[in-house]
Amino acid sequence: MLNQFSRTELIFGKEAMEKLAGSRVAIFGIGGVGGFTAEALARSGVGTLDIIDDDKVCLTNINRQIFATRKTVGRYKVEAAKERLLEINPDMTVNCWQTFYTPEIADQFDFSQYDYVVDAIDTVTGKIELVMNAQKCRTPIICSMGAGNKVDPTRFEVADIYSTSVCPLARVMRYELKKRGVRKLKVVYSKEKPITPADDMAISCKQHCVCPPGTKRKCTHRNQVPGSNAFVPSVVGLIIAGEVIKDITGFRGVK
């Protein structure tokens, strides 16, 4: 019988759809990258999503984040995301974690209960901690490298962290992971050299912060606020979703 996932089943098959329905995926960070990953996984039939983010929707998020609209500005991202995801698939389960992932709270998460972990956060400390905890439990994890200050979505690719180049974030991650004995890690990264954002005080988030009241990590506390657009982080998020779906189902297409 036809259902909302019938077109997806035409490609992946019934068994794969059953695997997706029975899977649980954790997405750490649901901004420009993680939001599109969550959207794609919900539209692909993943049964349970855990979404982790402590941020509120800001006016400046609207240019790139799928859960950010004029109506959701000021709301916690996980709340706005859950509402939309359940509109897409009312039968799925969405667990919200309104928290910022750091080593100090890592023990709140049991990584063994996840079929896959998505790292879409923007701090090196948090990313390293995610990788270490996921791999300790032998839970598959995929990490997003730098998506800010870039304009060519066609340059992004899936690779092992030790095969990456150019990306400044990937360089730091390689160094830190090697020190910790991590041998491999699937990432999505780009060889495009980052653009230096305009130094224009009139549009500076640090000078004219519009973060909603109650925002814990405001622009004024950041070393630099990167430039962004609608067509780069979204592509990264969709690439990640594709990898998660293919790995969970074991489907690789026509050889």
Predicted features by range, described:
Residues M1-A26:
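N-terminal charged helix/coil linker that caps or initiates catalytic domains
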Residues L2, F109-Q113, T125-G126, K136, ...:
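Glycine-rich phosphate/adenylate-binding loop
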Residues I27-G29, I52:
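Conserved N-terminal Rossmann-fold NAD(P)-binding element of oxidoreductases
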Residues V33-G34:
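Hydrophobic/small residue at the entry helix of a nucleotide-binding pocket
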Residues V46, I51-N89:
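Glycine-rich phosphate-binding loop and adjoining beta1-alpha1-beta2 segment
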Residues Q98-A106:
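Conserved SAM/SAH-binding loop
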Residues A120-I121, S144:
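Short, well-ordered coil/turn residues at beta-beta hairpins
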